[in-house]
Amino acid sequence: MRTSGSRLFTSESVTEGHPDKICDAISDSILDALLAEDPRSRVAVETLVTTGQVHVAGEVTTSAYADIPRIVREKVLEIGYDSSAKGFDGNSCGVNIAIGAQSPDIAQGVDTSHEARVGGTDDEIAKQGAGDQGLMFGYATTDTPELMPLPIALAHRLSRKLTEVRKTGVLPYLRPDGKTQVTIEYDGDRPVRLDTVVISTQHAADIDLDNLLAPDIREKVVDAVLADLDLPSPLDTSDIRLLVNPTGKFVLGGPMGDAGLTGRKIIVDTYGGMARHGGGAFSGKDPSKVDRSAAYAMRWVAKNVVAAGLSERVEVQVAYAIGKAAPVGLFVETFGTEKVDPARIAAAITEVFDLRPGAIIRDLDLLRPIYAPTAAYGHFGRTDIDLPWEHTDRADKLRAAAGL
């Protein structure tokens, strides 16, 4: 039962077999292959999937070679689309490629920053300009041990579990495409009750929804995930509304059901709508693109602020001008949960973190093939893989800089 001061907040996730996530995975797999051979590769790869077809386009400047058709087919098969009975088959789908070089007009601003052109510098970090203008946000909260909002964290866990029970054969009749949605009741800033879970999963034909699928999803997915929850404060899960495939059957899925595109799940990729978003997608982009690298840096900053005890919730924004190394703006929002003056937090961030693109790439060691695993189940708050922007290695320095 909701209390008078409560509110409901909802976030969604999708499985790796969702058409848009197939595209993200292909784009990031191509990126990783290029970075593995040439860490200085400039990559902007977009993917489209539709019935029986994969289209890869974009701009790449590199000394590396990537066998793109092979990468595409291997990724599609790894996800689980290996038969026409599933609506898509990595063995036989068409693969079309249209890739050119990065624009020299963009490259000049990344290779030689505005600061270097105007003032001259021997500082290699200062020489690298931002690959585009834009604004990026980072967020952290004490909802979960990984300092993520609970709705998106739980939605991702459910999506990962859907894939796990499919791939391990626990529920062999499941198919790769699927979505999850979680509604949490908050009392103020504290999550107190799980209100609704929606799970839509592709399945084999002739599966009984009420007598097989729904009970299996409750036991093998929802109950299993909830049993593993370890939260800072109690969460009431005693009266969950569970909706499994509320449209009925879900046999036709994947690229046959819907066309997919890289970069169409940016809220799923980040904070599930709990924080603002600058609009830039991640997958298929090398770290010279601040859409990706600066968003990772902002998560790193936000997580360290909360881990340092400076605020229970924080959202940080950074902004860049194309070709300029130094950010043009930094904003800190603490939602009234700060333990010190927000101005001191902002000053501490500026002292402890170098937010120039070259410094972000250096400090987070981003010129590595680490991106394909981020293409599904979120780029932030991951507990299943080690990501450098999830480290709280600067919390002590932040505390000291803020005077704690």
Swiss-Prot record:
Q: Which HAMAP family match?
A: S_AdoMet_synth1
- EC number of this enzyme: 2.5.1.6
| Protein name per Swiss-Prot or TrEMBL | S-adenosylmethionine synthase
Q: Where is this region: Flexible loop?
A: 102-112
Q: What organism is this sequence from?
A: Nocardia farcinica (strain IFM 10152)
GO terms under biological process: one-carbon metabolic process; S-adenosylmethionine biosynthetic process
Q: Please state which protein family the record places this protein in.
A: Belongs to the AdoMet synthase family.
In which pathway does this enzyme or protein participate? Amino-acid biosynthesis; S-adenosyl-L-methionine biosynthesis; S-adenosyl-L-methionine from L-methionine: step 1/1
Query: Top EC class per UniProt?
Result: transferase
Q: How does it assemble?
A: Homotetramer; dimer of dimers.
Lineage top rank: taxon:
Bacteria
> Where does it reside?
Cytoplasm
Cofactor dependence is on:
Mg(2+); K(+)
> What is the name of the gene encoding this protein?
metK
